[in-house]
A protein has these predicted regions:
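A conserved, positively charged/aromatic
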Residues: 1-9
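Carbohydrate-associated surface elements
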Residues: 17, 37
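Acidic anion/phosphate-binding donor-loop and adjacent secondary structure
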Residues: 38-57
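Conserved donor-binding/catalytic core segment of Leloir-type glycosyltransferases
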Residues: 61-79, 85-88, 102-103
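Nucleotide-activated donor-binding/catalytic signature segment of Leloir-type glycosyltransferases, i.e.
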Residues: 113-140
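Aromatic "clamp/platform" in nucleotide-sugar-dependent glycosyltransferases that forms part
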Residues: 157
Length: 175
């Protein structure tokens, strides 16, 4: 890639490996290490008792034994929110909708997305298998939501680096 590195004014390397490669292959090219990051004092594995209390406060007795899936994205077409609702509902029918819950943390009526409330209502997905979390919350609350989830779901088309993926993994929640 030397010819490409040499033809570039500035390279922003998102990993130390890339930074070292560029520096070795093309030492005269301006190269900056700019890692993706989240607040590691906020997005981290939290104490189980705190998470259990948060889950009880937010999911109630009904959510105690459910497997929780978490989706935290803008409700934009490329994030495929409506498709996710369909796929999750099909999965819920296979395992029993009383056993699983998808929490979609998003604006359900984003002008660049789909009307999630209408989709849930029109397809009878509004029975508790899919919940919408629409309020803007501080990062500490969001971290608790990642910790409460058993798994984070992240599908999209033409994605950037995936901030939600990094936040979730930082909290110890698999994607």
């Amino acid at each position: 890639n030397k010819k490409w590195y040499d033809s570039t004014d500035v390279i922003a390397s998102i990993s130390k490996v890339t930074y070292d490669i560029v520096n070795n292959v093309s030492p005269n090219t301006e190269n900056h290490y700019v890692p993706h990051a989240v607040q590691d004092d906020v997005f981290k594995k939290l104490p189980k008792d705190d998470v259990a209390g948060f889950r009880a406060d937010n999911m109630g007795e009904n959510g105690k034994d459910k497997m929780i899936f978490f989706w935290n994205n803008r409700n934009a077409r490329r994030k495929q929110s409506g498709t996710l609702a369909l796929w999750f509902s099909e999965f819920a029918e296979e395992v029993g909708p009383e056993n699983v819950c998808l929490i979609m943390h998003t604006d359900p009526k984003d002008v660049h997305g789909q009307d999630l409330e209408a989709i849930l209502h029109d397809h009878d997905y509004d029975d508790g298998r899919i919940l919408i979390s629409r309020e803007k919350v501080p990062p500490t609350h969001l971290s608790m939501m990642y910790n409460m989830a058993d798994v984070t779901v992240n599908i999209s088309d033409a994605e950037g680096f995936g901030l939600g993926t990094l936040e979730s993994l930082s909290c110890g929640t698999p994607i």
